[in-house]
């Protein structure tokens, strides 16, 4: 089983976590230089067995990754060993159908409607012995299409465009018919959830709160130990594909500030160092570790929570963006890792490494304190206090910015933002949140549960940017934390999702993005590489970037 590094919905991370025509040649959105860095070795060159200790920032609170509480990188990392998906991205970031589950997928027009026919691997089964098949596809669609609002969802995109999911010519064929064209159809059913989980809203929302009861991957769930702070998976004896090299994978929760010591002491086998220059320096100085780097769809940003009396005025949001020298921040924070390549990110949708990338920031992209002041005065913030902070009547121009503990890079970013914003008369109040509480209410959680004003975190994207990112901007979507958007933006993204011409899709998505920059939905800071420090004895694991992980091949060299 090969699992997408990131599934269709974007994932939150505190770790510091198409084809142009309808076909399977994609992704047309990926650039040609998206190489991974994983120390590739043939399975025959590896020791058979062993336990890989995979660090996570916290225990997963909800193992259903399609449910908002499970929309976390640490949950996806665990479930990627167990959940089936229809395709993956190989070492060249090219889409490939996963023959462990789908032997072929063909798209056609039937009575004028887009129709996808999946031929399933007849050997595929869940750990309860039930065959992987139509019931799972139907259940996944029913749970995720938005028809029944009791199913709490991270995203309905793609599924809401499906008209029917039916049996094909035999029991191993599934036919999906769309109501209207959906360009990123290859992203749908990644993953496929078991019918037992999708049987009812109660099952969907609660059944996997303490652990996944079923697997159809090379590993199966064993236990979660809240004292040891670990989740363990082991080889799935019912797995029909290539035998995994490893016996077990332990996902161990370690605060980020303590991860480099744990890695150097051999307690874990890797850590993400992309947001911790101190860890990079120490890892590079160790003869036991390898630092691996790959371009990746990860971007740091300042996102507004539900708007307040201060942040509801778009002129205030625009002024904050204008007050920031995002390039200086990028070079200060990312320069030690990326060198001269460190730069600000100017596109919410298409990051560097994806086709259609362009600068959509307009007149807000470069620091302009004078213009920031002008917009603040137009918004009524004309009084300047002795401390340099502006006010409008009794309302002080103050914004609380939350950030997670144990993250040096984020702490430094917040200090830079605070200093630069003050030059325009905006008070940024840094508010440290324990990392274990950062992605739970009332902090960075799906709308309307998150109650923060402004937060610093990263979105981890993937190779289907239009369909996945549109969910972050759609009004009413739980992932649009501040509900900043418009009907015009929704319409542009909807059109981009429902046509096949790549050039037209890109233009529509970029037009939507330009509107969102003017609305200051969020302030994109910089794109981070996938940078990890790994035990030198580990093979087929590391910086995956835009490619997928094959958990059957991960292991230790002889």
Question: Where does each model-flagged region fall?
Answer:
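Extracytoplasmic/peripheral linker and loop segments enriched in polar/acidic and small residues
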Residues: 40-45, 427-439, 467-536, 558
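Structural transition elements
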Residues: 324, 341-385, 405-412
